[in-house]
Amino acid sequence: MAFRNPIYQLSNTEDLNLDIINAPSLENSRRSSATLAVCTTEDSKFLYGTTPSGGAEWCSEGINSVRPSKRLLRRRRHVPRWISDSFRTCLPKSSGNLKEQALQPSLDRNPCRNGQADEALRNKRIGIAEPSNYWHGIIEETYDEHHQRQRNLHLIPENWQDVNLKNGLVAIIDLATDHLQCSKLIIYVDKHLPNLPYLVKSFHWVGFEPIAHPNCVDHAVFGMDL
């Protein structure tokens, strides 16, 4: 069971340094009403906030002033076996090795300087903590029929019961579009969920479309062009 910060309700608070969350770079007025998605990769850690009324706020500059503990630098986040198996089955083989990678934040550079995502993000495992859940994903870099490079963000949440489609997905869509520079968001939904019809309706309402995927036996796949 995930431990949660009573103020922000972020899952798995051990993944975060509370000094970073409370960094002065995020104003109190914005912090009290913001929905936060916390993005971690093997070589960077940065925060992304979006308000319920829309609009985005990057507060990654606060990370450079706070050094995470040695325990945090060494820590590996456990990836549930069923999620790893799902990615191994459903993702294209070009995504590379899907072994769990250590999350070691880099303090020497800003991963979103000038609004651009760090080049090291491509084909990397990524974790996103939003207010009521934790998402595991992979950023896959591909080329379209016109040989234009594009990034696809593939995501599976740990618990569909806690998915907040209104706030959580808005934060994730903004994160993928504005700063991870992804052109497509792909979400895998367990076909055996009792609330699957509700989720399918909700995904259609948000703008997702079903994607045929013969290799995905246990999951329905939904995609959105960003």
From Swiss-Prot:
Ornithine decarboxylase (ODC) antizyme protein that negatively regulates ODC activity and intracellular polyamine biosynthesis in response to increased intracellular polyamine levels. Binds to ODC monomers, inhibiting the assembly of the functional ODC homodimer, and targets the monomers for ubiquitin-independent proteolytic destruction by the 26S proteasome. GO terms for biological process: positive regulation of protein catabolic process; viral translational frameshifting. Belongs to the ODC antizyme family. Pfam families: ODC_AZ (PF02100). InterPro entries: Acyl_CoA_acyltransferase, ODC_AZ, ODC_AZ_sf. GO terms for molecular function: ornithine decarboxylase inhibitor activity. Interacts with ODC and thereby sterically blocks ODC homodimerization. GO terms for cellular component: cytoplasm; nucleus. Gene3D superfamilies: 3.40.630.60. This is Ornithine decarboxylase antizyme.
